[in-house]
């Protein structure tokens, strides 16, 4: 989504991924643990709260490749680093795992800069509904695992929907391939969801957002959860009102849910 949000729209091409964990201490197919390699015996084996390093490396890699293939952005390269070290009484390790997801894309010179919001521009959200997903994801991912309760940490986990991202991308691509791109500005929904994305769209001038127009998948969400959840595969756009009907027609063609929210 970051690459879709370059300038006033751009094209993702390929994905990359870097995985960083503590030593995985791999198990055999029958579930037994083989003898530790010399470097794996530096620190004692820890009890892991959610997943072992081995499980993370397998599942994260499978997930990144699966999402990229379904979205149409193949994962073409990456890196893996496992690390544990003890220096005197200090212990260091990637117990707090890191996955760096990146990629390659391109955009045109015409569309490389965002436009300036004007009175009358419409704030548009494209993509999926709001759910109790990814609440505080940006904050929880920045502190030690286990600092918060299990409920808070598990609610902070983001879930992926590659089909919805493909629909949103098809709309964005169609707009940037036109002779006159109707997009004034575009941002992806990342950390803090609507609160972050829609604020960035109107940060230079301010704007009005009608929360009743935001799509709700879970009717039990509070107002805070609606504006701050990180349900994935959503883009925020500023569109000049005169182009709105045209953009709606393309969204309908691509089956990309589109909502005018401000």
Listing of model-derived features with the role each one plays in the protein:
Residues 1-262:
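Glycine/proline-enriched, intrinsically flexible loops and inter-domain linkers
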